[in-house]
């Protein structure tokens, strides 16, 4: 077996294990935004929000006006973690044309991002040579979710998983925890992506099951 095939098998096994862990040991995170919070979101734009970087600095999204932005919640121990590679490639290919990528580690899904911010950064640079900005680990669902995510979810809710070999397994896992899971805008799993256009609108939401080529085409159309 070649090294490439070994890596493919490794990540496939990891995703299977992580989904099993989700079924056995995790619950669907609580509903995200109240009606009042959603009403507040309507009056805001993405440029009203700030984030904390992995090193503790402040990042004003207003500084990204006129850019196309890909925002993704990530984890280092997930079967979707190899998506770091095509995400980094997109950053290198399109950053000069106006693409920005914001990586927001999150430990809410199967506990798959347990490391410190420094450990997560070291993992990503060592295994995937990432160069795009990485934020401080944060929640994307529930009472402690980032205000940015309350806004993002108010703009684009969940529309279903894409055709994928793990689609039925994901759906069964969430249905077991909450029969109404598909009606809620919450982030469902690691590597959910939001694409922001140059005017600050949420152009698209992609679930982790989405083909990376489809995401790249969306980004290219906005540059």
Per-region residue spans from a language model:
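Thiol-based oxidoreductase modules, predominantly thioredoxin-like and allied folds used
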Residues: 98-115, 131-142
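C-terminal motif of bacterial Sec signal peptides marking the signal peptidase cleavage site
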Residues: 20-23
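Conserved helix-turn-beta segment immediately C-terminal to the redox Cys motif
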Residues: 67-68, 76-77, 81-106, 124-128
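Bacterial N-terminal signal peptides that target proteins for export
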Residues: 2-11
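N-terminal "domain-start" segment that seeds a small globular fold
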Residues: 29-62, 82
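Thiol/selenol-based redox catalytic cores and closely related redox-interacting motifs
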Residues: 129-209
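Non-catalytic, surface beta->alpha helical segment in thiol-disulfide oxidoreductase systems
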Residues: 203-223
């Amino acid at each position: 077996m070649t090294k490439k095939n070994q890596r493919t098998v490794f990540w496939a096994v990891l995703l299977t294990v992580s989904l099993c862990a989700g079924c056995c040991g995790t619950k669907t995170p609580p509903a995200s935004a109240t009606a009042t919070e959603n009403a507040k979101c309507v009056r805001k734009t993405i440029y009203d929000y700030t984030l904390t970087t992995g090193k503790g600095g402040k990042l004003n999204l207003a500084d990204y006006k006129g850019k196309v932005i890909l925002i993704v919640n990530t984890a280092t121990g997930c079967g979707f973690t190899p998506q770091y590679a095509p995400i980094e490639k997109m950053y290198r290919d399109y950053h000069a044309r106006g693409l920005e990528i914001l990586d927001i580690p999150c430990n809410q899904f199967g506990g798959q991002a347990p490391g410190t911010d420094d450990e997560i950064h070291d993992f990503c640079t060592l295994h995937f040579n990432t160069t795009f900005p990485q934020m401080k680990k944060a929640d994307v669902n529930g009472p402690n979710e980032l205000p940015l995510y309350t806004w993002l979810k108010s703009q684009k809710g969940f529309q279903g998983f894409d055709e994928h070999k793990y689609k039925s397994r994901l759906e069964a896992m969430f249905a077991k925890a909450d029969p109404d899971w598909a009606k809620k805008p919450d982030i469902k799993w690691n590597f959910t992506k939001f694409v922001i256009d140059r005017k600050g609108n949420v152009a698209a939401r992609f679930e982790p099951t989405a083909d990376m080529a489809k995401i790249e085409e969306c980004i290219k159309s906005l540059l």
